[in-house]
């Protein structure tokens, strides 16, 4: 519940070019600052983040955080222009418009998405909980 913000850390990967290394979301009022990912030491964070036991599976070169109540609910796009990407269902096409943009990341109603570093695979997710045990910050490490 509440307002969430998203951030992406992009890194220069030489011949691979600039890639999305980390995608993060934080609760606007309680989550740790995005400096946690800007420092580039996300595997050794000082924010008391916990590595989750699941892998974030990627098979389309993109991953994101979404409000479960609205995930793949096409009604969130009713007021938006039609997506430019022409393959797949409406949700997928809108997400691809974001990940195929110059930024390779962005927000949509009830979510945030980015391209996934070097593409498909399994990636690690970390979370931070507030004093009540409610998750208020999460990020996926791609690179």
Predicted segment positions?
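Intrinsically disordered, low-complexity acidic regions enriched in Pro/Ser/Thr
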Residues: 1-143
């Amino acid at each position: 519940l509440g307002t969430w913000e998203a951030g992406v850390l992009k890194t220069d990967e030489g011949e691979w070019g600039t890639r999305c290394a980390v995608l993060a979301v934080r609760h606007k009022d309680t989550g740790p600052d995005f400096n946690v990912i800007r420092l580039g030491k996300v595997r050794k964070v000082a924010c008391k983040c916990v590595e989750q036991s699941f892998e974030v599976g990627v098979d389309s070169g993109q991953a994101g955080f979404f409000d479960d109540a609205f995930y793949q609910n096409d009604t969130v796009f009713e007021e938006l222009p039609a997506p430019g990407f022409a393959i797949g269902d409406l949700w997928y096409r809108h997400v691809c418009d974001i990940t195929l943009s110059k930024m390779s990341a962005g927000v949509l109603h009830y979510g945030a998405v980015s391209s996934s570093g070097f593409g498909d695979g399994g990636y690690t997710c970390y979370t931070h909980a507030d004093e009540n045990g409610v998750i208020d910050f999460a990020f996926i490490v791609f690179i």
